[in-house]
């Protein structure tokens, strides 16, 4: 059984976030990518040892084409064409509503530095991101109602860094990579709705240390 290979800490919203389909998805994704992720983290240490002994970083011959002045990239999605005003903040429900209503072009919901990675914050943060994409993110607090405007900032999500574990999800005996959990839950719960709105799941990947990562 899947649950023999994955243990997820209890939470009052656990069954809403971690459906059987989600659990299978997270298990398969972690098994596919965790070994490579661990190798890349080890390569960080190897590079640091080289730098500590006097080696200096340089450009790789195999990536020379991207430094050619003729090199171009594809156009960004339409709703990311204008990022002149972009704000970021935690995945708290009230703060997300205010940020999405702020008039900024892009709001980056940050599971990393802006959010204390308690289990409650992570689980509720995923609910909040899902509700934002489905445009039903709302809150009543201290007698005041908070709702999304008709036009909101484009939503981007910043998952936690490669190096961070999610100790509340144990897969095959080890904590799951937090980055894969944040990414996987967001894609599973929001991709279909985002595409239906002619948008997409947009991610800011923090603290990468090489092009391989």
Language-model regions, residue ranges each:
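Glycine-enriched alpha-helix->loop->beta-strand junction motifs that scaffold or abut catalytic
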Residues: 103-106
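Acidic, Ser/Thr-rich peripheral helices and adjacent loops at domain boundaries
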Residues: 125-138
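Conserved mixed alpha/beta core segments that line enzyme active sites in large multi-domain catalysts
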Residues: 72
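Glycine-rich, proline-tolerant flexible connector loops at the mouths of alpha/beta enzymes
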Residues: 51, 108-124, 205-208
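Short acidic loop-to-helix transition motifs that present clustered carboxylates
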Residues: 91-94, 114
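An N-cap/entry alpha-helix motif that binds or orients negatively charged groups
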Residues: 34-68
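Conserved alpha/beta-domain cores
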Residues: 3-28, 32, 57-69, 77, ...
């Amino acid at each position: 059984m899947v649950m023999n290979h994955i243990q997820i800490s209890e939470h009052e919203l656990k069954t809403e976030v971690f459906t059987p389909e989600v659990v299978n998805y997270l298990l398969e994704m972690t098994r596919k990518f965790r070994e490579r992720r661990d190798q890349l983290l080890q390569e960080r240490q190897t590079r640091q040892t080289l730098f500590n002994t006097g080696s200096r970083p340089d450009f790789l011959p195999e990536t020379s084409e991207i430094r050619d002045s003729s090199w171009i990239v594809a156009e960004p999605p339409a709703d990311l064409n204008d990022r002149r005003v972009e704000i970021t903040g935690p995945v708290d429900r009230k703060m997300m509503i205010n940020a999405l209503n702020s008039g900024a072009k892009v709001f980056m919901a940050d599971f990393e530095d802006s959010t204390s990675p308690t289990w409650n914050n992570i689980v509720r943060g995923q609910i909040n991101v899902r509700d934002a994409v489905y445009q039903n993110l709302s809150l009543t607090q201290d007698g005041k109602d908070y709702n999304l405007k008709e036009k909101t900032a484009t939503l981007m999500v910043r998952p936690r860094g490669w190096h961070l574990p999610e100790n509340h999800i144990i897969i095959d005996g080890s904590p799951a990579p937090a980055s894969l959990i944040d990414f996987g839950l967001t894609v599973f719960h929001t991709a279909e709705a985002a595409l239906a709105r002619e948008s997409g799941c947009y991610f800011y990947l923090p603290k990468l240390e090489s092009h391989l990562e």
